[in-house]
Amino acid sequence: MKPPFDIAGDLDTPVSAFAKLASLRPRFLLESVEGGERQGRYSFIGFGDALEVKLDAHAFQIGDQRRAVPKDAHELLQGLRDALRLAPRPEPSVAQVPLAGGLVGYTSYDIVRYFEKLPSIAAPLPNAPPLLHYTAPRSLLVFDHSTRAIALLHAGSESDRAALRRAVVDALRGPAPSTLNARGQYTPPVAALSREDFIRGVGRTKEYIAAGDVYQLVLSSRFSGRHQLDPFQVYRALRLVNPSPYMFYCQLGELTVVG
C-alpha cells in the first residue's frame, strides 16, 4: 500500500480544497490556529456518503433507523453507542493523526435535561434545531501542513479508494468556484433579550452567586437575523477576523454550523 500522504498539498489551502470538492459533497471542515498565530499541523475535510445521526422532538434518527425519542439518559447513550458502532471507519489508520473518522457535529445544551431534572421556563423555539446532529462520512482528507501533503482515508475497498483519489486530484487541479468570492446581503442580528432584561438577569445572577446557589453562571442571549449569504463565506470571514483553535464548518442537512 502507498504511504497515506500521497497527494500534493502545496497549492491548496483547506478552504480552497473544500470549495473545489463541491461535487464530492463535502460535509465538514475542521481547522485550528494555536496561540493566535501558529497553524495547527492537521486540517480535515469529511466528504461523500455519510451516516447521519439526529435527535429532534419527533425521532432519533441513526442512518436508516428511525427510533422513538429516548425516554431517558440510558436510551440516549445506547443510541449514541449504536451510532458509533455503525459509523464508517476510514482507512488506512495513521497513528499520529488525531482524527480518523467518527461522528462530527454538535450536541445542544438542552441535552442536559436527559441528565438533570430542570424546569421548562422558556417557550419552545419555532424551528428549533435538533438537540443533537452528527455526521460520519465514509471519506476523509487529512492535510499535514508540516509536509504540505494530503492523505485520503476511505471506508471501502482499495480500488474504490484509488478511484476516489483520482477524483479528488482532478478536483484539486481545477479552478476554485467563482462563487467563492460572491457577496451577499444581511440584516443586523437582533437579540432575543432586551438590554434591560439582560441587565436584570446579571443582577439576579450575582444574587444567586452571593447566596451560594451557584458558583458560575453563563448568561447568554440568542441573536437572529436574515441573510442571503453563503454560509461558507461566513466561515471564511470568521476565519480571517478571528483565527482560533478548533474552527469548524459543518453541513448537517439543511443546517450549517459555523464557529
Where on the chain are the PLM-derived regions?
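Extended alpha-helical targeting/anchoring segments
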Residues: M1-G259
